[in-house]
Every structure is written in structure tokens, then in C-alpha cells.
């Protein structure tokens, strides 16, 4: 035993074991011991000689490995298999080669051992021999080489050699004289002649390359009468093209000729599978050869010969000719050539395969790898089963073994049974499973498992998911498949005999139904090529009857043309009824049909090629339809299955029906195309109409066009039954029509959904517009012909983001307005087309901006919201136009731009005039402003002062920025123009400031930039708004600096210049909205901003977050509202401001901080409230991140931002600001009124405003110094105006509407988390709110609640709300007109007062900003629902009413707003708090209450 156990070292394998006491275990144990007597005794008991151990090793393998010659002889004599595969793929031949014993190896080779086999590592016996060591390997390798040489000589015709050397034993070198005695078996003696009855007896020889014999004395043949031929004997036919097709993952079959016989040769093809072991895969052919040599059946592909290469390394199998190819290629790769498989053909093919499978089972074989690859269609209607390389053979012990250990390729998992995939024992039930899968595949035209990768299928099965029967299967076949696809083998109750019985009965019934049609010969026509899809159904190509003979011969002629014309990877193409390009089909040879069909074919192929996923008619559906047609042909009254319409009457009626159906199909096609166009236009980027859907649609649409070629080719169908033809066409057309109907239904559903979305967006926009109009009470002031916009060039009109922003912000009203005009007509996603369009306008606006900034601002601003006025005008016009002219968006927007430009110019002059008029009132306003400033300062000092929404403005800017962000390209240009305008404005401001004085320059610049920059800056205002905000902080900084030094003024000029540049844009937009002219408020806004900067410093991050949230909310709103656009623009601006302005402010922040510290000191010296006022009116000038940094850098600053841009002189600033504010209020009210009134009016007002702005710009040049201070105001005004655009037109209306709407809006827009976070942040950083503020907050809450109710009512009554808002706006506009006129008169009177008014205006603007943030908040909220919009609108209406009342008292109201002492101011702080812009504690309380509400 010890001797037997000792293995040669190094041994390539280990020996397995058997742990039981069975005879097999004893046999293995005795073999290891080398006990010949006991082994023979056990063998005599009839034990299974090839019983395996734990490693799959047989007793013969162990004996050969250990070199036990006698045991090998006895085991072979008892029938041990020399080629039995161990689990590692090795065979006893490998073991013998390793043992180094030539006798053992020769014995195994004589018994049929094969030297070509490989183990799982690709090692053949020669490799094993070399592993044994040089001493033993040399002899073994030489022996194997002699065997190979002998075999080669025999193959080459030297058969006489067999007479001398008939056994490998005779090739052993150094055979002992008494070798026969040494073998232990007289039959194994190499010296004795072969004797009949033994393995090497008679004519059977084996030299390690398969058992063969000589036929006719010379021809070498393998067992099974398989001639062994050389490679040169198989050649390509010269009368047919090369035709190759895949017969599985690793095999390729090629049509060749052997000795004049047309054959198909199978060979290994691993080029596409480089990771597979070519050496090991070669064993597959050997295994199939051995299996095929034992099988003979009419439906098993007949192996005719074996082709060996000269070096015996390569084997090719020669089969009978396969004319068509595999079933897989017919169903999935070349379906165009076989548009329809008749049902009787399908059943006939399935019966043939089931017969062959039953034959295999009867012989003890299990196919295991049955798939559509293994079914070869040798000719029309004739199928053969092949691919036997993975087949397993039953053994005596009942187990099955395969000739190779090659695992089943994952590519075949789609058809394999679960037990085969997970490598468990396979049975005949496994083949039934695979057969059921094929039945489903051929009837549904779908690859099993939808073509999933094998590895995925295996994972799916392991996870407990299995393939299920397709419910589309016909009844009898559904039962078959359902039973066969059961997971457990025992549940597959149907056997092949049952399946065959069901199929035969079904075929009989089917054929019996067809016998009434003598003209029908579907079987002959089964595989005809049909370039015309209309004849697909019957496979009745419209060729003359000669085509029935199109069988093998014609298919041969087509040859490789058949091969996968659609590509190997387009299995789904099969589903398309479209025929291949006519050239592909032999039928194409008929030119008359070619000409007729080629157009349709080309279209069909084009339709197919785009999407392999196209799901046109499935073959089984066509088959059913065809079957139904056959039935209906017999019984015209019977309905075609699945068509739902009875085909009645004679051929004439059918012809009429066919024509009518074709016409209907064409109509449907056009409708589908139209709907598709609409759908595409409605959303260029919309994925609702996916590419697959589109391709599928195209595919289906192509089919209706085919009837025309079919009609053209009708002449060729003389020999066919007209009834059959018409029925086929009608059925196909009906099926296509059904498909088109489904497509149309889907498209209509998608379009309807989009339309509903657009309607909702439009409603929201309309509500927002009305809300916005109501908030912009100045819209009602459109009556006043002169625009009283802020003179400061730095004035930043509320950026009403134009279509670009609107596009950017699907929720923004502005976006929606501009977008809706485009979107409505196009049905495009509101943001997509309009976005693209707006981007284009924006680019154009860039160029235009360079040419004419005013004009560019208008044009660009519109796409970019660069010009709030133009945006507002366009928005109003869009709001008005969109409903009436959804498709006129470009027109309306263009007019909006033009009108914006014109109105900007005219309004500029008007604003300047109003400014002059306001200068007169400047003194009073200034005084009031001072008083208010003092009050506000006191409040700020005590922590009770409500900080103007510098953050709100930033929030608005952020929102608008967010909106602009959606329009990045336009935004960039806008920013560029903005910077250009800003620089120019800054330069101009510097010039004007130097000569004219800060206040005067501020006014002049304000007006000038408003007018002059209004056009370009309208465009830039969108971009500039961010700089403007940046500049605004600079402005506040500059105002302080201006009071401190001219350098600060210059800085403010540069900053304001940008701001004013933005502001003119904004003012242009605002002129459209009329809110843009809130420069005074802008100044006031700076004051507020100063306060808010304090708040920002304390809570700017939260505010930023809040603003970001507002921006996020505003974006949805922006699409619906200009307010949102303004907010979006503001958001962009504030983002830009936050980035450039606030970040720059960061650098300036230190200076600003110093400036703030110093100016506040001076202010404190003058008036302690000035610091608070500065806090309110000044804005930190950090351009890059001052906004964020301010909040972070100076969280503990009481109220002043790091840098104050508000002039130190509260009186002059307040007067100027008041004048500006009044002018702006009146102008914005006019614009708002105009916008709400009509697009044309708003456009005209925009034009007028543009003109005014132009004149104002020109005048502003002289007022550069004033503009410095006023620029800051305009910047804030721009923000405020933006806010007014959202909230109200006038500062008062803004203050009121924003207060109420802000509270409600903030409540709605601010998320609880955000509010809580902001509140907490503010709580941490800010002092507790005063009782007065709390009271105000409660009052505001009540107003909000009422406004919410109003909003709901408004939502239900948006029209009335808009009217009310317009009315309120008009009222406010009148009051604002008065105020603005007074303010402008005052401004004209006193430049210093203008500066002061600018401050006051800034304060007022700050108030407006504070309110606009609410609007901004409302805007974000508005997207949440029309109710909110309505409520915001109602709130704004109420606020506007209050504003109108206050506007009647412009001086009084302004000071209040500026100082924040007024009730509005208190409300504003509440709103600010809610927004998180004001003191955190207040905000927290308001936010919490709002949230709780």
C-alpha cells in the first residue's frame, strides 16, 4: 500500500478518496495498493469500473498515474474509459504520460485514448509528460511524437503502414523480448498480431487521435464512418458567396464544398473570446465528433467528415449543408430577410427539434446546451439539432458524464435550465426547460431573459428569480411553456411526448383551417425574402409564383448576404416588420420589385438601424394575425385576430378598405409626426420622448409608408390570391395602425402632461404676475408720462429676469413669461427651448451690448433679465402676451427689448426730470429722512431697528442669480457687459464725482446711468446686479467714504458705476416694472443694507442660506413670475455680488469696516442714529465673499456692515433718496401698471423708460458725483426694484407689500429648517427683539394669515387679484408719482439734498429691498402654489394699498421707510427677521410663527 501511495514528485495532481465501504471505494483502495488479485476479483462482481473518487478520478487514472501496468491492463479490459475526465479535466492518458511508462500509455492509446485532450489548464498529455522530469519525459515525448507521425502518414494516404504498425505498442522504443509477458495481458503484447474480439483487433486503430479504420482499404475513417480528410479537401465554392454564421459562442460554421458536395464546416473561433482557453475549447470539437459519430437521426445535424490539419492540432467537423443558418440568426440577426415565420412553419420546426431531442434522450444523452443556436435550419422548413459538444451521456451507474469538463458558456444561460446554470445534475427535464424557452422565443421573437448577460442571469437565479412564461403566447403553447419553465424539475410535468402531441394537434387544426385556401402555399414561401413589409405577414413576397422554388438554391446564391445584414448585435431588429434593403434579399434581383420597394426598405432600414429596441410587430403577433387572416380568407365575416375589425366583402371592398386604411395610416403617421414634433419642440431636452420611443415610433411610422411601394408592386402579384394579399396588407396595416394608435396615445399623454405642466406654470406665472403687479403698485402710475427713476447711474433696477433667467428658473414668473411665450407654442419644457432661445438672444445681446449697451441691455436683459425694466416690460408683455400669443414670445420679447430700450431712454430723461423735481422736495424729504434715520439708528443701536434686507436683496439677488445661473452663458455675457458698464459707469462716476461732488455726482450718475446704462445695464443689470450688489456694498462704503473722502466716492463710483450700470439695466427692467426707479429706496436699501449688513455680519451665512433657499424657491417661481426673475436676477446679482461684490467687499471689508467704524463715529458725532442708518443704508463692499465673510467676519457687529457705502449725510442722502425713491416709485408704478395692463403698454412704457433712462443717463453724466451717492442708492434701488418687481412698484408699496407679502412669503418660502437655522443663528448673534418688533411681528402674522387667505382667494380668482393689484398699483403709482415728483424736484434743487435723498432713497430702497426679499421669498413660495402667489398678491395688494396711502405722503412715508420708524419699517424688520435678514431673534420669532402658521 505504501508503494502505491507514493506518488511521483512533483505530481501535477493529488489523489482523491472515497469515504465509504462500497465496492467502488474498495476498488480504489486496492488499486492504490497495487493489489491486482483483489482488483480483478471486485471487477468480476460487475462493479462500475469508472467509479470516481472525490476528485473525479477513476481507478484507471490512479493506476496509470502510479504506473501500475497490470492494473491498467485489467481495467482497460473491463472497459475503463481512457478518456474519462477528472474534475480538473485530466484523463488517464495524462496520468500515463506523467508516469513515464510507455506500455501504459500505449495500452490507453490502443483503447482509444486521445493525445489531443486538455485539462482545465490547457495542458495536454505531452505537457504532463514534461512535468515528470527530463529522465522520464524524454522517452514519453518521443513515443507520443512517433504516434503522431504515424497518424499523419496514414492520413496522407500511407495506409500500408497500418499493416506493419497497427498499434501504438509497436511504436514503443526498446520493447523487451518478452514484452508480452510483461504486459500482464496477452492481448496487450505489441508483438502479437491483433486478434478479433479485442480492442485493437480487426480494422480499428487508435494512435492517440481517435479510433479509426480503413474503408475500402485506403480511406481513413473514424468510427461512425466519418472520413478523415485533410484541410485541402475542403474548399470554397466558386459559384456562391462565402457564408458564415455563429453556431454558438465559440463555434463558427462556414459553407464550403468537399468533393463536390456542398457542406458546412464547423471550426473553433475564439477571436471574439480571447479570455477563453483555445487549447481547452478545442476539446469541444473532439467531443462533438465522438457524440455525432454515434448518432444518426433525420433531425440531428449529420456529421459527414472530420478534417484534420497536417499537424493534427486543428480539427474541423464537416456537416451537411446548412442553407439558412441558426434559428437565432433568423429570429434576431437577420429577421429582415425572414419578416414572418408562418405559424405552421414554426410548429413544424418545433416538432422536428422535439423529435431529435427525444431521440437523444432515448440514447441516454442529455443535450444541456439546447438553444436557438443549436437549431440549424438547413433548408426551408427543415431544422436540425446540433451543438452536441456539451452533451452528457448516461453511464452504467445512472450518472451522466460529459466528454469535456468545459463549463457551459454564459452566453447560453439564456436558454439553460437553472440546475445547469448552477452546475447541478442535469436530467432530461433540463432539456425540456430549454425547449420550452425556445418555444417562447420563436413565438414572441424575444431573446430569453431579454438578452441579459449570462453572469447577470446566474446571479438572478441564485437570488431566486426565474424566467416566466410570456402571457402573449397562444393558449396551447402557453401551457407548454408554463409547465416547462418550472424551477423545480419535478414540477415540469410535461414530457416531450406530451408536448409533441399538443403541437401535432395544433398543427393539424391550423393546417385544416388553411385548406380552404388552395392558393396558399405558406410552407414553400416560409423563408422567402420580402423587401416589402406589406407582404411580410404571409411571407408571401409579391414575387411571381416562381419564388416558391426559392429554397436552398436561391438561398445558396444569396450566400453570405444572408449573414447578419443588420448586424450581429441587433437582435431586436427582428421585431421590425420592415424588410432588409432589397439588395440584401435575392428577391431584390427582381428589379420591378426592387424599384417599388427600395424607398420603403431604405426608410424601414433607417428606422430599424437607429434603435434595435424598436418594438414594431412581433413575429408571433404577425403570425397570429396571419393565421387569423388565413381564417378570415375562408370566412370573410370572421374578424382577423387582434385587429378588432372584420374584413368583409370582396376584393374591391378590400381594396377600398386597404386604401382607406393606408390613408388613415398616413394620416396617423402625420399626426404622430406632428405630435412628435410638438413633443420635441415642447422639450428639446425632454427625455419623456425617449430615443427608444422616438426610434420605435419612426420604425412604426415607416411601416405606413410601405403600402405605397406595395401598391406600386401590386402588378407583380398576379399569381397570388388577391384576397390573401389584401388580407395580409389589411392585417398588417391594422396592426401598424394599432401600433401607431398606441404611439399617438403615448405621445398625446406626454403632450397633455406637458401642457398641464405649462398651464400650471402659466397659472403660477399669472398669479405671480398679478401678485407682482399688485406689489408693484407703481404699475398703476403709468399714467404719469415722465419716468421718475433714480438719477444715480449706480441705480440697480430690480432685475426682472428675462426669458433667460426665466428659463433658468422654471419657477420664476419672468422665466415663465418669456419662456411661456416660447414654451407655450412649442410645448417645450419651459426651460429648454426658451433657455436655448434666450441664450441665443443673450449672446446676441452681448454683441448688441457692445454695440449699444442700452439696447443690448434691453435685448440681453430680456434673455438674461439683464434689464429688469425690459424684463418687466417683456414680462408684463409676456404675461399679457403669453396667454394671447404663446408663440409670440420672441416677438413679444423683442418688442419688450425695443420698448425697454426706448422706454429706458425716455424714462431716463423723465427720471432725470422727476429727479430735478424731486430735488425741490429734497429738503423736506431730507428732514424727514434724517428724523427717520435717527429713529432707525436708535432702533438699530437698541437692536430694535429692523435691518433693511441687505440680505434680502442679496437673497433676491441670489434668487435672481439662481435664475440667471440657469442661464449661465447669457449670464456671463451680462456680467461682462455689466463689468464694462460698471467700469464705464465707474469712470464716468469718478469724473462726474470729481467735478460735480459726491451728492451731485451720485444723482447725476444715478440718473445718467439709469438712463444711459439702463439700456445696456438692463442687460448688465442682470449681470451687473451682482456687481451692483457688490458695488452697492461699495456704494454704502463709498457713501461713507464720500462723506469721508472723494476716494471712497470714486470707489463708490467704480462700484456704483457697475451698480449703476446694473441699475440702469435694472432701471430699464424696472421701468418696465416701474419698480426699478426706486433708486432712493435703493439708497435707503443701502441704509437698510448697512443695518442688514450688521445683521448679515451677525447672520449673513444664514441669510445667505436663506437667500439661497429663497433663490431655490424663487427659481421655480421665476418661471412663473418676473418677481422671481427679478429675484433670480437679484440672486444672480447677489450671487455675483456675493462672489464679486461681497468677496471684493472682503478686501474692502477691512476698509469698509474701518470706514464704517470711522463714518459711524462721525455719524454718531453728528447723530448717533447715523450709524444705524449707515448700517441700514450701507452695504459691505466685499466683492468676492464679503456677503458671506461679512456675516462670518463681523457676526457681532451691532448694525453696521464692515463697510458702509451710504453717504454720511443722512439729510442730503435721504432727500436725494426720497426723490429718487419717489421718482422710482412713480415710474415703477407706471411700469407695473403698464406691465399689468398690457404687454404693449409695458413695452411702450419700457421704451419710454428707456428713452428717459437714456436722457437720464446723459444727465447723469453731469451728476456723477451725485451718482456716487445715488449710485449706491440705485444699486439698492435696483435690488429694491427687483424686490418691488416682485413685491411692489413703489418703495412704499414695496415696503407694504413686501412687509405683508414678505412675512407670508417668507413663511411659505422659508423652510422650517432654514427658518430655524436662521433664527437660531440670529438668536445667537443678534440681541433679542424689542417688544415693539414682536408686536409688529404679531401684526404682520395676522396680515400674513389674512394675506394667505387672500392668496387662496386670489388663487381661485387670479384675474380679479391681478385687477385689484393693478388698481392698487395705479393708486400707489399716483401717490408715488406725487412723491417721486416732489422728490425729484427736491433733488434738482439741492444736489447735497439729492445725496441725502439718495441716502433716504437708499433707506427707502432698503425698505423696498426688505420688502422685495419677501417678494423674493414669495416668489420662491409662489412656485409652491398659486395660492401662495395669490396670497402674496393679496398681501402685496394690501401692502400696495398701504404704500399708496404712504405714497400720498411721500416725505412722511419715505422717512419712515428710511428710518424704519414707521409701522412699515417695523413690519419690514419683521419681514426681514422672517427672511433672516434682520435681527435673528426677530427673524426667529417671525419665522417660527410663520412656520407654525
UniProtKB/Swiss-Prot annotation:
The record's listing under SMART domains reads: ANK (SM00248)
Q: Which residues carry this modification: Phosphoserine?
A: 430, 560, 660, 1100, 1262, 1400, 1492
Short sequence motif named GPPX3Y, residue ranges: 789-795
Q: Where does this protein have compositionally biased stretches of type Acidic residues?
A: 1066-1075
Q: Domain Protein kinase, which positions? A: 198-511
Q: Where is the signal peptide?
A: none
- Compositional bias, Polar residues, is annotated for 559-573, 855-904, 1001-1020, 1053-1064, 1131-1144, 1343-1362
Motif stretch (D-box): 846-854
Composition bias, Basic and acidic residues: 1026-1037, 1154-1167, 1363-1380, 1426-1456
Which positions bind ATP? 204-212, 266
Posttranslational mods: Phosphorylated on Thr residues by CDK1 during early phases of mitosis, promoting the interaction with PLK1 and recruitment to kinetochores. Phosphorylated on Ser-430 by PLK1 during late prometaphase promotes the rapid depletion from kinetochores and its subsequent degradation by the APC/C complex.
Major location category of this protein: cytoplasm
Region described as Disordered: spans on this chain: 559-615, 782-904, 940-1081, 1115-1167, 1288-1307, 1341-1466
Keywords noted in UniProt? ANK repeat, ATP-binding, Cell cycle, Cell division, Centromere, Chromosome, Cytoplasm, Kinetochore, Mitosis, Nucleotide-binding, Phosphoprotein, Repeat
Sorted alphabetically, the Gene Ontology BP terms of this entry are: attachment of spindle microtubules to kinetochore; cell division; intercellular bridge organization; male meiotic nuclear division; mitotic sister chromatid separation; mitotic spindle assembly checkpoint signaling
Q: Where are the ANK repeats?
A: 27-54, 55-84, 88-117
Q: Which domain of life does the UniProt lineage start with? A: Eukaryota
Annotated Gene Ontology MF terms?
A: ATP binding; protein kinase activity
Q: What does this protein do?
A: Required both for the formation of intercellular bridges during meiosis and for kinetochore-microtubule attachment during mitosis. Intercellular bridges are evolutionarily conserved structures that connect differentiating germ cells and are required for spermatogenesis and male fertility. Acts by promoting the conversion of midbodies into intercellular bridges via its interaction with CEP55: interaction with CEP55 inhibits the interaction between CEP55 and PDCD6IP/ALIX and TSG101, blocking cell abscission and leading to transform midbodies into intercellular bridges.
Q: What does the sequence similarity comment in the record state about its family?
A: Belongs to the protein kinase superfamily.
Quaternary data = Interacts with KIF23 and RBM44. Interacts with CEP55; inhibiting interaction between CEP55 and PDCD6IP/ALIX and TSG101.
Query: What protein is this chain from?
Result: Inactive serine/threonine-protein kinase TEX14
The record lists the organism as: Bos taurus (Bovine)
Its gene is TEX14
Amino acid at each position: 500500500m505504501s508503494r502505491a501511495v507514493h506518488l511521483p514528485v512533483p505530481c501535477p495532481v493529488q489523489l482523491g478518496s472515497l469515504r465509504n465501504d462500497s465496492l467502488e471505494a474498495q476498488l480504489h483502495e486496492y488499486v492504490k495498493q497495487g493489489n491486482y488479485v483483489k482488483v480483478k476479483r471486485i471487477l468480476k462482481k460487475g462493479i462500475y469500473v469508472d467509479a470516481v473518487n472525490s476528485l473525479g478520478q477513476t481507478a484507471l487514472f490512479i493506476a496509470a498515474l502510479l504506473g501500475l501496468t497490470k492494473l491498467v491492463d485489467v481495467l482497460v479490459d473491463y472497459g475503463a474509459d481512457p478518456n474519462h475526465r477528472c474534475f480538473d479535466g485530466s484523463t488517464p492518458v495524462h496520468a500515463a504520460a506523467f508516469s513515464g511508462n510507455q506500455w501504459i500509455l500505449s495500452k490507453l492509446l490502443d483503447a482509444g485514448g486521445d493525445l489531443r485532450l486538455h485539462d482545465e489548464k490547457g495542458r495536454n498529455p505531452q505537457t504532463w509528460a514534461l512535468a515528470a522530469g527530463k529522465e522520464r519525459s524524454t522517452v514519453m515525448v518521443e513515443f507520443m511524437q512517433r504516434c503522431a507521425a504515424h497518424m499523419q502518414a496514414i492520413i496522407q494516404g500511407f495506409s500500408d503502414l497500418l499493416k506493419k504498425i497497427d498499434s501504438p505498442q509497436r511504436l514503443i522504443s526498446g520493447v523487451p523480448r518478452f514484452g508480452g509477458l510483461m504486459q500482464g495481458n496477452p492481448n496487450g503484447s505489441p508483438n502479437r498480431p491483433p486478434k478479433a474480439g479485442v480492442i485493437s483487433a480487426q480494422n480499428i486503430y487508435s494512435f492517440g487521435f481517435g479510433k479509426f479504420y480503413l474503408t475500402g482499404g485506403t480511406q481513413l475513417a473514424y468510427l461512425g464512418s466519418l472520413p478523415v480528410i485533410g484541410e485541402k479537401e475542403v474548399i470554397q465554392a466558386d459559384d456562391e458567396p462565402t457564408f458564415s454564421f455563429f453556431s454558438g459562442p465559440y463555434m463558427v460554421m462556414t459553407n464550403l464544398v468537399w468533393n463536390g458536395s456542398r457542406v458546412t464546416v464547423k471550426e473553433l473561433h475564439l477571436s471574439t473570446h480571447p479570455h477563453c482557453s483555445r487549447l481547452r475549447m478545442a476539446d469541444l470539437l473532439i467531443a462533438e465528433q465522438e457524440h455525432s459519430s454515434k448518432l444518426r437521426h433525420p433531425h440531428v445535424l449529420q456529421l459527414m467528415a472530420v478534417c484534420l490539419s497536417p499537424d493534427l492540432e486543428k480539427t474541423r467537423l464537416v456537416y451537411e449543408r446548412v442553407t439558412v443558418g441558426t434559428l437565432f440568426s433568423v429570429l434576431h440577426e437577420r429577421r429582415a430577410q425572414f419578416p414572418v415565420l408562418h405559424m405552421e412553419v414554426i410548429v413544424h420546426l418545433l416538432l422536428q427539434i422535439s423529435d431529435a431531442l427525444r431521440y437523444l434522450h432515448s440514447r441516454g444523452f442529455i443535450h444541456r446546451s439546447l438553444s436557438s443556436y443549436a437549431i440549424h435550419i438547413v433548408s426551408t422548413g427543415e431544422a436540425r439539432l446540433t451543438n452536441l459538444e456539451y452533451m452528457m451521456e448516461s453511464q452504467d451507474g445512472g450518472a451522466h458524464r460529459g466528454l469535456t469538463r468545459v463549463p457551459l458558456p454564459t452566453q447560453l444561460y439564456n436558454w439553460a435550465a437553472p440546475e445547469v446554470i448552477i452546475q447541478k445534475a442535469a436530467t432530461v427535464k433540463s432539456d425540456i426547460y430549454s425547449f420550452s424557452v425556445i418555444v417562447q422565443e420563436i413565438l414572441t421573437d424575444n431573446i430569453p431573459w431579454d438578452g441579459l448577460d449570462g453572469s447577470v442571469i446566474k446571479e438572478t437565479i441564485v437570488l431566486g428569480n426565474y424566467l416566466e412564461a410570456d402571457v402573449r403566447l397562444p393558449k396551447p403553447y402557453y401551457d407548454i411553456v408554463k409547465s416547462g419553465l418550472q424551477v423545480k424539475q419535478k414540477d415540469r410535468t410535461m414530457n416531450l411526448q406530451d408536448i409533441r402531441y399538443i403541437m401535432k394537434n395544433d398543427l393539424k387544426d391550423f393546417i385544416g383551417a388553411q385548406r380552404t385556401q388552395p392558393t396558399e402555399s405558406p410552407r414553400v414561401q416560409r423563408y422567402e425574402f420580402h423587401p416589402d413589409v406589406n407582404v411580410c405577414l404571409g411571407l408571401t413576397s409579391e414575387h411571381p409564383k416562381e419564388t416558391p422554388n426559392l429554397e436552398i438554391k436561391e438561398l445558396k446564391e444569396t450566400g453570405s448576404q444572408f449573414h447578419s445584414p443588420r448586424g450581429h448585435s441587433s437582435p431586436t431588429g427582428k421585431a421590425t416588420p420592415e424588410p432588409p434593403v432589397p439588395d440584401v434579399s435575392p428577391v431584390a434581383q427582381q428589379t420591378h420589385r426592387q424599384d417599388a420597394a427600395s424607398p420603403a426598405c431604405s426608410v424601414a432600414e433607417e428606422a430599424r438601424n437607429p434603435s434595435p429596441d424598436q418594438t414594431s410587430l412581433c413575429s408571433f403577433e404577425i403570425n397570429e394575425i396571419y393565421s387569423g387572416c388565413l381564417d378570415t380568407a375562408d370566412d370573410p365575416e370572421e374578424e382577423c385576430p387582434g385587429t378588432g375589425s372584420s374584413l368583409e366583402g370582396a376584393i374591391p371592398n378590400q381594396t377600398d378598405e386597404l386604401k382607406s386604411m393606408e390613408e388613415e395610416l398616413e394620416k396617423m403617421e402625420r399626426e404622430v409626426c406632428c405630435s412628435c414634433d410638438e413633443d420635441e419642440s415642447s422639450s428639446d431636452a425632454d427625455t419623456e420622448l425617449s430615443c427608444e420611443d422616438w426610434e420605435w415610433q419612426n420604425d412604426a411610422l415607416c411601416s405606413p409608408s410601405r403600402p405605397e411601394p406595395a401598391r406600386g408592386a401590386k402588378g407583380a402579384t398576379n399569381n397570388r390570391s388577391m384576397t390573401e394579399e389584401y388580407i395580409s396588407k389589411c392585417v398588417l396595416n391594422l396592426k401598424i395602425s394599432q401600433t401607431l394608435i398606441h404611439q399617438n396615445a403615448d405621445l398625446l399623454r406626454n403632450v397633455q402632461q406637458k401642457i398641464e405642466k405649462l398651464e400650471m406654470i402659466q397659472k403660477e406665472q399669472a398669479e405671480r404676475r398679478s401678485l407682482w403687479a399688485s406689489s408693484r403698485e407703481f404699475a398703476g402710475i403709468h399714467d404719469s408720462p415722465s419716468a421718475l427713476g433714480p438719477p444715480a447711474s449706480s441705480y440697480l433696477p430690480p432685475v426682472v429676469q428675462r426669458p433667460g433667467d426665466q428659463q433658468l428658473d422654471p419657477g420664476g414668473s419672468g422665466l415663465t413669461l418669456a419662456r411661456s411665450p416660447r414654451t407655450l407654442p412649442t410645448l417645450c419644457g419651459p426651460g429648454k427651448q426658451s433657455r436655448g432661445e434666450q441664450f441665443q438672444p443673450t449672446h446676441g445681446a452681448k454683441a448688441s451690448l457692445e454695440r449699444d449697451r442700452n439696447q443690448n441691455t434691453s435685448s440681453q436683459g430680456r434673455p438674461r433679465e439683464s434689464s429688469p425694466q425690459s424684463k418687466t416690460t417683456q414680462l408684463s408683455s409676456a404675461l399679457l402676451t403669453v396667454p394671447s400669443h404663446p408663440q409670440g414670445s420672441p416677438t413679444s420679447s423683442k418688442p419688450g427689448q425695443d420698448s425697454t430700450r426706448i422706454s429706458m431712454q425716455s424714462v431716463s430723461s423723465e427720471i432725470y426730470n422727476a429727479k430735478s423735481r424731486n430735488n425741490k422736495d429734497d429738503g423736506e424729504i431730507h428732514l424727514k429722512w434724517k428724523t427717520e434715520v435717527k429713529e432707525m439708528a436708535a432702533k438699530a443701536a437698541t437692536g430694535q431697528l429692523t435691518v433693511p434686507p441687505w440680505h434680502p436683496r442679496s437673497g433676491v439677488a441670489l434668487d435672481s442669480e439662481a435664475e440667471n445661473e440657469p442661464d449661465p452663458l447669457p449670464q456671463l455675457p451680462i456680467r461682462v457687459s455689466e463689468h464694462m458698464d460698471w467700469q464705464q459707469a465707474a469712470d464716468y462716476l469718478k469724473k462726474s464725482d470729481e467735478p460735480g461732488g459726491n451728492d451731485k455726482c451720485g444723482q447725476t450718475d444715478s440718473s445718467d446711468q439709469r438712463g444711459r446704462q439702463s439700456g445696456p445695464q438692463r442687460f448688465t443689470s442682470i449681470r451687473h446686479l451682482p456687481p451692483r450688489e457688490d458695488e452697492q456694498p461699495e456704494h454704502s462704503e463709498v457713501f461713507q467714504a464720500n462723506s469721508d473722502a472723494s476716494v471712497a466716492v470714486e470707489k463708490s463710483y467704480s462700484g456704483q458705476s457697475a451698480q449703476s450700470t446694473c441699475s440702469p439695466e435694472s432701471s430699464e427692467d424696472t421701468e418696465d416694472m416701474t419698480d426699478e426707479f426706486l433708486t432712493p429706496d435703493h439708497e435707503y436699501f443701502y441704509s437698510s443694507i448697512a443695518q442688514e449688513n450688521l445683521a448679515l455680519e451677525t447672520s449673513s451665512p444664514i441669510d445667505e442660506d436663506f437667500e439661497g433657499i429663497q433663490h431655490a424657491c424663487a427659481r421655480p417661481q421665476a418661471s412663473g413670475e418676473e418677481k422671481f426673475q427679478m429675484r433670480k436676477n437679484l440672486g444672480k446679482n447677489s450671487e455675483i455680488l456675493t462672489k464679486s461684490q461681497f468677496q471684493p467687499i472682503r478686501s474692502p471689508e477691512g476698509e469698509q469696516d474701518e470706514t464704517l467704524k470711522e463714518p459711524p463715529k462721525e455719524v454718531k458725532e453728528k447723530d448717533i442714529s447715523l450709524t444705524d442708518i449707515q448700517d441700514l443704508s450701507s452695504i459691505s463692499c466685499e466683492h468676492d465673499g464679503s456677503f458671506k465673510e461679512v456675516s462670518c467676519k463681523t457676526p457681532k457687529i451691532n448694525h453696521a456692515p464692515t463697510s458702509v457705502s451710504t453717504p454720511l449725510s443722512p439729510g442730503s442722502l435721504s432727500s436725494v433718496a426720497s426723490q429718487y425713491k419717489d421718482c422710482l416709485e412713480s415710474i415703477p408704478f407706471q411700469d407695473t401698471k403698464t406691465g399689468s395692463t398690457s404687454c404693449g403698454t409695458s413695452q411702450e412704457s419700457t421704451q419710454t423708460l428707456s428713452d428717459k433712462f437714456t436722457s437720464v443717463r446723459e444727465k447723469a453724466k453731469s451728476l456723477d458725483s451725485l451718482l456716487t451717492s445715488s449710485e449706491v442708492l440705485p444699486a439698492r434701488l435696483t435690488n429694491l426694484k427687483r424686490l418691488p418687481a416682485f413685491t411692489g412698484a413703489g418703495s412704499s408699496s414695496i415696503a407694504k407689500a413686501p412687509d405683508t407679502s414678505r412675512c407670508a412669503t417668507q413663511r411659505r418660502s422659508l423652510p422650517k429648517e432654514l427658518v430655524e437655522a436662521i433664527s437660531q443663528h440670529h438668536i445667537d448673534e443678534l440681541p433679542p427683539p424689542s417688544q415693539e418688533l414682536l408686536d409688529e411681528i404679531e401684526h404682520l402674522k395676522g396680515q400674513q394669515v389674512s394675506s394667505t387667505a387672500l392668496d387662496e382667494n386670489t388663487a381661485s380668482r387670479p384675474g380679479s387679484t391681478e385687477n385689484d393689484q393693478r388698481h392698487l398699483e395705479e393708486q400707489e403709482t399716483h401717490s408715488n408719482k406725487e412723491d417721486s415728483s416732489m422728490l425729484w424736484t427736491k433733488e434738482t434743487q439741492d444736489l447735497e439734498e439729492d445725496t441725502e435723498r439718495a441716502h433716504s432713497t437708499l433707506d427707502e430702497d432698503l425698505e423696498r429691498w426688505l420688502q422685495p426679499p419677501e417678494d423674493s421669498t414669495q416668489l420662491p413660495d409662489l412656485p409652491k402654489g398659486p395660492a401662495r402667489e395669490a396670497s402674496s398678491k393679496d398681501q402685496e395688494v394690501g401692502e400696495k394699498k398701504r404704500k399708496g396711502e404712504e405714497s400720498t405722503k411721500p416725505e412722511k412715508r419715505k422717512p419712515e421707510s428710511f428710518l424704519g420708524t414707521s409701522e412699515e419699517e417695523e413690519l419690514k424688520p419683521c419681514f426681514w427677521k422672517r427672511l433672516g435678514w434682520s435681527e435673528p431673534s426677530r427673524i426667529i420669532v417671525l419665522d417660527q410663527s410663520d412656520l407654525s402658521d
